């Protein structure tokens, strides 16, 4: 499982919601720092879990730009999600997934196998 900031945002929300609904996860995930056994959090890895000098973390779009990864929605961010129509929301989410995947493919072999 690979994502951007998934250890601090996406997965805790999904797990708490699953717990509230009585849905047991189909597999257990490794939330330990510095581990890439079951979960690869690209933000944590690229910024050494907040231990790098300089800015503690940067957003996916900023990092994608540094790696010359195309962003089809440069003027939108997560704060705009509530006002997006369904078609734009789907395209926005697909764009984030594509950027994350491309970033993962470019960094593979440097931080994990």
Predicted regions and their residues:
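Metal-dependent phosphoesterase core characteristic of DEDDh/y 3'-5' exonuclease domains
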Residues: 1-91, 95-99, 103-112
């Amino acid at each position: 499982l690979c994502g951007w900031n998934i250890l601090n945002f996406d997965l805790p929300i999904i797990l708490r919601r699953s717990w509230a609904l009585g849905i047991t996860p189909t597999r257990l995930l490794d939330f330990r720092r510095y581990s890439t056994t079951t979960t690869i959090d690209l933000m944590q890895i690229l910024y050494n879990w907040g231990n790098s000098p300089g800015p503690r973390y940067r957003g996916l779009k900023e990092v994608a730009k540094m790696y010359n990864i195309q962003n089809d929605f440069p003027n939108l961010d997560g704060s705009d999600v509530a006002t997006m129509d369904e078609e734009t929301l789907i395209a926005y989410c697909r764009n984030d997934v594509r950027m994350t995947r491309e970033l993962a493919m470019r960094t593979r072999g440097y931080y994990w196998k």
